[in-house]
UniProtKB/Swiss-Prot annotation:
Example GO molecular function: zinc ion binding
Protein's name in the database: Structure-specific endonuclease subunit slx1
Cofactor(s) this protein requires: a divalent metal cation
Domain of life where this protein originates: Eukaryota
Lineage: Eukaryota, Fungi, Dikarya, Ascomycota, Pezizomycotina
Zinc finger extent (SLX1-type): 225-283
EC assignment: 3.1.-.-
GN (gene name): slx1
Locations listed in the record: Nucleus
InterPro entries assigned: GIY-YIG_endonuc, GIY-YIG_endonuc_sf, Slx1, SLX1_C, SLX1_endonuclease, Znf_RING/FYVE/PHD
Extent of Acidic residues compositional bias: 328-340
Family: Belongs to the SLX1 family.
PANTHER family referenced in this protein's UniProt entry, alphabetically: STRUCTURE-SPECIFIC ENDONUCLEASE SUBUNIT SLX1
Amino acid sequence: MLRQQMPIDRPIPSFYGCYLLRSTIRHSALYVGSTPNPVRRLRQHNGLVKGGAVRTSRGNLRPWEMACIVTGFPTSIAALQFEWAWQNPHITLHIPPSSRISHATQKKRSGHPKRPRHTLQSLLSNLHILLTVPSFSRWPLEIKFFAPDVHRAWLKWSKAATGSLRDTLPIITDFPPAESQVNDEDGEITDRPYGIEALNVAYEDTKSHLEKGERIFHSEMKESCNICNQDLQHNSGLYTICPNINCHSITHMTCLSQHFLRAEKNEQSGEELIPVQGMCPGCRMDIRWNDVVKELSLRMRGQKVVEKLLGAKRVKKGKGIATSQEVVESEGDEEEEEEEEKEQELVDYFDADEFHARNVAQEENGFVDYLDDDDSDAVSNISMESSKSPKRKRTIGPFSKAKLIAVIEDSDVDEEIEGEELER
């Protein structure tokens, strides 16, 4: 099998999250997945639009709700790594044996450890552990809770947990209001977006940062690094700019990184390579490293995205956040097909490399299922070929065409592959 490589010339994605889905009919029915667009993904799980997953297609469990979501992943693969570890805390190598609280007591027919049945408490406790282990503790992540009872369960476990979360890890709540409508400043009734509807999944938050970069970096620029004071030549290095609009600080990427890390070492010991956040040498405001390098990645690798974003019409007042996910969905068929091919590349990448799933056809296929224990492997295997890209469509065993049509397709790469895979 040829080793496949993922392209490294893409900018940091505007949004990617790992979510915990819960049935509103039966709260013990849980599902873990990942997506770049939570609103679209939830609609798929609830059968409102094409897509979703076999497990969430059961009518007696719909509608589903997103109880919480972890966001801020720097790449799609990073989200998949975290998702797989969250789905499989009993075998993931990211959790050291001394910290593991989920253990496999049974084996599948293939001989691999069978995932223990999860509860809300086990998923939240393992989420807490993953956010404290070295693999993920310094990632620029955020946790958002949309269900009050789930947040209370999280707080209860956090008090009893031995490991502590990073102080700068944002934990945000956005619960449904007492009334779905609130009065605006003019006294008129208006809908206030909340929960996943309020998530900004486009690059709108980065737009002003990009506009600032467009003004600074040009062929006749005469600037110097704010840290080392060396002259900065156009297109001859990786230069970072502060996201604060009124700040004029420009630095080498390595200079800013070392500046942040030196400040961190004064507060804690360790030999970290990538900072989390730090104080801008210009405006002296705290800024997040991920915000800085996201603009840099777009400037260096996402020219088409930048041109479209800066050249797009302004969104009408009051609809910025609420429509960000609609903007993503209305980009056109051509871009949607391109995105689907990228998602399929992610699946192929893990199939061929990270998971070494050579015998995946004989294995229990990967849909994250915390529902009934008596689900057969055959039902899981139906969902194996769920790519929407016609170029990569494959035939599945002896199943009839009618049965295949009845299966809800997957998207957003929320599959887990359980072959010979003890991941990264």
